[in-house]
Regions:
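Short low-complexity stretches enriched in small and charged residues
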Residues: 19-28, 91-94, 210, 231-234
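Beta-hairpin (beta-strand-turn-beta-strand) motif
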Residues: 73-75, 90, 136-138
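N-terminal basic, low-complexity leaders that serve as flexible interaction/assembly modules and, when applicable
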Residues: 1-85, 220, 251
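A gly/proline- and charged-residue-enriched helix-loop-helix capping module
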Residues: 90-127
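Short glycine/proline- and acidic residue-enriched helix-loop micro-motifs
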Residues: 38-41, 101-110, 161-169
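Active-site loop segments of alpha/beta catalytic cores
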Residues: 114-261
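A charged helix-plus-loop insertion that forms the helical arch/lid used to bind
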Residues: 86-99, 153-159
């Protein structure tokens, strides 16, 4: 359903400002916490279409929001590429050591098969709401950080260490661009009206490296999915004054900003 949020992003006239929250489905809701108690494995929860659909729609039963954003996680692509992921309380996600060369040869069909429950959940949500449905993904740089750092970089991150093998890093970025594109397309085919791309750790990049690792890979993805006519919201979190450069280079349908702006 292309409602007010979609119309606003497409620069059409609207009669009010549409609202949705990035974390609108999740831990602040007691009904979500009840489901979480019964489903301690977070990845398995994200791959249960019935529960994903239920969790996605929970906020809309409480608030008159303008969109339902699919309950999922940006790390579903690293999972589909073969990395085991564990969420540790107080630490966040921990990714197992994995041979990057094995990640580079994973086929599209294998990734899509593993992520199929997400697309099934989108179809279910579409059948249950007239609101815009937002699908999402992590951006190449942020996923690369998790894959190579093997945990949240919030407390421990070394850009030079992560990018020391430039050839390997560039190949991994290319692989992630490819897989993210497929993931977006499948979400669109399942019924997503809008796509959000989260580059949660873009702010870790030195300013001079933003074009190589943030702007250009995201632009490549947007160019590949442009033909589907679905607007894309981008969130290169933490890049401060470089938001204007991002917008002029990538030209997203909409931009999310953070408290540093």
């Amino acid at each position: 359903m292309k409602n007010t949020l979609w119309e606003c992003i497409m620069e059409k006239k609207t009669f009010y400002t549409p609202i949705w929250f990035m974390r609108q489905a999740g831990r602040y809701l007691p009904e979500f916490r009840e489901i979480r108690k019964r489903n301690p494995n977070f990845i398995k929860l994200c791959l249960n279409p019935n529960l994903v659909s239920e969790i996605t729609l929970q906020p809309l039963k409480r608030f008159d929001l303008d969109a339902a954003i699919i309950f999922s996680d940006i790390l579903m692509i690293p999972y589909a590429l073969g990395q085991k992921i564990e969420l540790k309380k107080g630490e966040g996600p921990i990714l197992e050591e994995h041979d990057i060369k094995e990640i580079l040869i994973v086929e599209e069909a294998d990734v899509i098969e593993k992520l199929k429950p997400i697309y099934q959940a989108i179809k279910q949500v579409k059948n249950k709401t007239k609101k815009s449905v937002i699908g999402f993904t992590g951006a190449p740089w942020t996923l690369l950080v998790y894959i190579l750092n093997k945990k949240s970089p919030k407390k421990n991150f070394d850009f030079n260490f992560i990018t020391q093998d430039k050839l390997l890093v560039n190949k991994l970025i290319e692989k992630l661009v490819e897989m993210i594109t497929f993931h977006i397309i499948k979400q669109i085919e399942a019924g997503a009206d809008i796509i959000q791309v989260f580059d949660s750790w873009a702010g870790l990049l030195p300013k001079k490296e933003l074009p190589n690792y943030c702007f250009d890979p995201t632009l490549e993805i947007l160019q590949r999915v442009k033909k589907f006519g679905v607007p894309v919201i981008c969130f290169p979190r933490g890049i401060k004054e470089s938001y204007s450069d991002f917008c002029s280079t990538v030209k997203p349908g909409c931009i999310s900003i953070d408290y540093n702006v």
